[in-house]
Amino acid sequence: MSFVSITTWRMIGETETLQHVTDLMVRKYFPGLLALGAKHSMLMDAELDRFAIVTVYPSREVRDDAVAHISALRSEGAEEFGAELMDAFGGEMLASSKACV
């Protein structure tokens, strides 16, 4: 069963923008998450100065095996994004409009 991770972030840098975060995600962090075993990852504009990253892994085991690397990416990302991690949670995907393998 797929495992979904959701992190929410708040921009704290004075010069960073959501476009800056988007560029970093596309260039560096999406490829990094996929290399760690993620099936898919998305960046979402949550509101004003906040954004969320939603990542789908094939299973909890795949995510758990990569958790140390994911933590390092989050720390590095916080600095590069000019944002602070507000919350991180995850769980088994129970249903989806898209077929999950």
Regions found by a protein language model. Give the residues of each.
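Short S/T/G/P-rich N-terminal loop/turn motif that feeds into the first structured element of a domain
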Residues: 1-52, 56-75, 79-101
